[in-house]
Amino acid sequence: MNLVGATLMSKGPEIRCYDYVNHPYERVRDALRQDALTVFQSATKAAASRAQSIAAELHVDIGGVGVKTDIRISVKNVEEKVLDAMSTPATRLLLEWEAATKPRLFPLMKAELSIYPLTATETQLDFWGLYEPPFGAMGKAINAIVGHRIAEVSVHRFISDVAGYLRQALA
């Protein structure tokens, strides 16, 4: 069981997504180890400005209506390990985020971002997280109808923005 799973023990819905960066593992790892928060902020703000919208960390369009919120991300731990018998290296960042303003209106996310080489020139970003919907029982009902899809789309966009930023920044 991973650290997030051990911490939350399935206390919320799960989200998993991945993307890749066409740069060697060591360069991607070093960029995220050096200052992951700046990478996350730069990636999401750059994506928001490209879309000519208000800069926000998480954003998703639902039926043509944009939902955006700034988030406060904290990196709880960074660890390096070997994935398999072939000594494939991996780095895991334990993340937590919540809305920067009015956090009770948005889910709390606890996640792992694992980084490992796919090839000598490509690196995988693998996100696995659990989130707690707001509003208790009512929030769980809303989550079952539409909330989980909103959370999935926003996390997918976040990882896509981070991967896109790293592709350009490391070029």
Regions found by a protein language model. Name each.
Residues 28-32, 125-127, 162:
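Hydrophobic pocket/interface hotspot
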Residues 71-84, 109-117:
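Hydrophobic/aromatic beta-strand elements that line small-molecule binding cavities or substrate pockets
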Residues 91-99:
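Short Pro/Gly-enriched beta-strand edge/turn motifs at strand-loop
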Residues 2-70:
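Hydrophobic ligand-binding cavity/cleft-lining segments
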Residues 159-171:
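Short, highly charged C-terminal tails/helix-capping segments
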Residues 100-152:
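Beta-strand/loop substructures that line and gate deep hydrophobic ligand-binding cavities in soluble
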Residues 12-18, 90-92, 108-110, 122-126:
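Intrinsic-disorder/low-complexity, polar/charged segments enriched in Ser/Thr/Lys/Arg/Asp/Glu/Gln
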Residues 22-26, 82-90, 114-124:
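A short, structured loop/turn motif at beta-sheet edges
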